[in-house]
Amino acid sequence: MLSLSKNWNTLIKPNRVTYENFPETNNKAKIIVEPLERGFGLTLGNAMRRVLLSSLQGAAITSIKIPAIEHEFSSIPGVQEDVSEVILNIKGIEVKMHVSEKRIIKLKAMGPCVVTAGMIDTGHDVEILNPDHVICNLAKNKQLEMELTCKVGKGYVLSTNSYEDNLPIGEIAIDALFNPVKSVTYKVENTRVGQVTDYDKLIMFVETNGDVLPEMAVGLAARILQEQLQLFIAFEEQEEDKQVKTDSLPFSPYLLKRVDELELSVRSANCLKNDNIIYIGDLVKRTESDMLRTPNFGRKSLNEIKEILAKFNLRFGMDVPDWPPENIQELSKRYEDSYN
């Protein structure tokens, strides 16, 4: 009987996750995951997007209370907008809560002024993430007072499905968007592993409201998926002999280690990647003069790599028989324990 683990151990696994923040804000990030088996980019991208946009917890304003106003079809003296417009604007306020219990925050303004979210007195437990967001326009010598209830939740909750079944008279429930992720898009491109060029590279663009950073949001979404899928693993894995027989190889198993697993400087790593050097075996077959002819590769990078190779009793210019092996990816996985 074939080993069950061959169903997943023979698949290529992503070994690089890169997070690139946009210079103007920390709330937007580009996440690159590679390499993936063909088709897995679309599978993972779609699943991650759906979880990011639906299942993360966040905070939102769930109800408001304005003196002498009992429902959303009223008007507020001195306020240019009617109550329904004010509610629509309040729905756009992005909040962050440092506690899990509900909190009531208060707004008090005197006209003439443009009332913004930054005027709200939030106390220590609530933070306004978009303080310049406009709530309404207040006329001269007119005062506006308001209490706003903030809660923690997930997804989008309609006012008709509010957590509060019995709101006090005068308190108006509003639709609440708890999700801290504002947008998620993704695309899939080809990436190269060895001589194979049709593996998947998943590129995701994630924007949050600042309640969580994009990289944290992606991590939480991945954990949610992991927890949901765990139940499907309804079998016991067979204990396999992990003793690696290195004498079956015509070369050192260290040559099967990927160069991107080495602790190289960014410059050295990029030079090797651009020259299509994937494994240490690819690297040691090169001579020092070969390496120095590589674009942007200098003596400093050469010495750095020589020191690392020496730790494995390896050097440049080695004669490696039968390199590269046809099943190099499978061998690399099989002998992983011997060089880690």
From Swiss-Prot:
Region (Alpha N-terminal domain (alpha-NTD)): 1-236
Disulfide topology: none
This protein's UniProt keywords: DNA-directed RNA polymerase, Nucleotidyltransferase, Transcription, Transferase
Domain note: The N-terminal domain is essential for RNAP assembly and basal transcription, whereas the C-terminal domain is involved in interaction with transcriptional regulators and with upstream promoter elements.
Family: Belongs to the RNA polymerase alpha chain family.
Quaternary structure, from the entry: Homodimer. The RNAP catalytic core consists of 2 alpha, 1 beta, 1 beta' and 1 omega subunit. When a sigma factor is associated with the core the holoenzyme is formed, which can initiate transcription.
Name listed for the protein in its UniProt record: DNA-directed RNA polymerase subunit alpha
Native species: Rickettsia prowazekii (strain Madrid E)
